[in-house]
C-alpha cells in the first residue's frame, strides 16, 4: 500500500486531523480535530474535482438526480472554523441551505459517503481543499448611510447587517435608527436586491407605545435607544416593555453625559430584562466613564465596535475628530468639545481588549461610517485576538494551537449576534439547516480578504482577476460582485428579518418585495449565558477620577500595540 507523508497529503487534499494552520500573519494557530472527508482512516478516495481526479462520471460522481436528493453544491475538503469546533469536511448545500458536513462522493464506488452528500450530475463543486470556511459575518451595529457599504461589507466577509438609517441624514449618521413605517418600507424596498440579510432597528426613544407598535408593524426587527434622541430611564423602560410584549431586541447607546442618570439608573430602568448594550467599550459612547461595567451583568448582551479594536498607539489620535463629525458637534463650542473628550479614555479602551479575550464582551460590530469601518469587522476581531495572544499567551485548554481563542473570537461576529437578535434559526453558524451564508478564506489571507462569499448557496462576491484575461487569475485580482449579487438572485438568497407582528399584520402583502420576510424569534429570554464562548461575567470597576479599570480586582495596565498583523503587509493604504 502506498503511503503519503503529511506534507504530501496536505498538498494533494489539504491539511487533515492534527495539522495546524496559521491564520494570516498573526500568531494564531488552529488545529484540525476531526476529518470527516478523508485523512486517517478515510484516506484514498477523497472527493476532489479536476482533470484525472475523483469527481468524474461513474467514479466520484454517481447517478443520483436532484429529485433523488443530490446536493446543488459541495465544498470539498474545507476546514470549518466555527464556535462549535474546528474540523475538516465536505460541506453540502441544497436549496440555499447547509444539508451536511461529512464525506461527499458516490456510494457505488466509495465507502463512508454521507447520504446527503451523494454527488450527482446536478451537483456543482467548489474546491475548499487547503482553505478555511466560516459562517457569514453578522455586523450588529450598522448605520445605513450610503448603499456603498454593502460592497465594503461583502468584501470583508459580512452577509448580515443589523442597524438602521435612511441615508446621509443627520439622524442616520449618528444613531442607527430607521424611524417610522414610511422610512422602514422604503428601506426594505431599497435593500431588496442586495445579497445581504437585513434587520432594521426602529426608534425606541419614546414613551409612546403606539408609535413603537406602529414601527413593528412596519417591518423593523427591534429597536434602538440612542442618547442623541434621549436615552432616559423612562424611554428605556417604555421601549423594553413593548419589546417584551412583541418579542424583539433592544439595542442601547446610553447617556454619555449622565444627564438623566448614571449607569446604575440605566440598569435600574432595564430592571433585569434582556438588552443588547452597544458601545460597552472605551470610546464609543454611553455613561462616562463606567459604561464598560455593564458587561458584568447576566441580562446584558454587550458588544463593542471596531474603531477601538485593538488598542494601538494611534487609537486616541483619530477618535476626537471622528466623534465630532459623527455626532454633529462643533469644536467651537466648549461643551461639545468636553462631551467628545469625556468619551475617549485610554484605560477603558485597553480594558476592552481584555474583556473580549475573557469572553465578557460578547460581540463586535462596525459602527459603519459613524466612527467604525464596515469592511474591517472581521479583520479587527482577529487583530484583537492576536494582540491578546501576544500579551496573555494561550487560553486555558489551548496548548500548541489556539482553538479555544479562535472559537471564542469567531463567535463574536457570527453566532453571538444571531442569538442576541433572534436570528440563529436561520444564520450564525456552519450547521445543518441554516442558510448557506458562508465565507471561504485562503489561510494566508484569513480575515483580510475572502476568497469567496457564498450567499444563500450562491457565490455573491469573490476575488477575481481581469475579466478579459484567458483564465480567472491574472492581476488585478480584486473583490468583485458575482452572479449571486445580481438583484433577483440576491433577493432569492437573502432575507429581511422583521418583528413577528409585521407578518401577522400583512406586511408581506403590503410591500412588493422579492425576498422572504423572516420573523425574529426567541429573543426576550436570552441572557449572557446564551452567548456561546462569550458568557463571562467578571467584576468590573472603574475609578471615577483616574478611570483606572479593575477586572476581578486586578488593574489592567495600558499597553497599546505599536504594530499589528493583517495591516501593511496586505494593504497599500
Swiss-Prot record:
Among PROSITE patterns, the record links this protein to: UREASE_1, UREASE_2, UREASE_3
N6-carboxylysine-modified residues are: 224
Which gene underlies this protein? ureC
Urease domain: from which residue to which, for each copy? Answer: 136-573
**The name this protein goes by in its record:** Urease subunit alpha
Q: Which reaction does it catalyse?
A: urea + 2 H2O + H(+) = hydrogencarbonate + 2 NH4(+)
Lineage of source species: Bacteria, Bacillati, Actinomycetota, Actinomycetes, Mycobacteriales
Which pathway does this polypeptide act in? Nitrogen metabolism; urea degradation; CO(2) and NH(3) from urea (urease route): step 1/1
Q: Note how many cofactor molecules are bound and how.
A: Binds 2 nickel ions per subunit.
Species per Swiss-Prot/TrEMBL record: Rhodococcus jostii (strain RHA1)
Record keywords: Cytoplasm included? yes
Q: EC number(s) for this protein?
A: 3.5.1.5
The residues that the entry says bind Ni(2+) 2 are: 224, 253, 279
Family in the record: Belongs to the metallo-dependent hydrolases superfamily. Urease alpha subunit family.
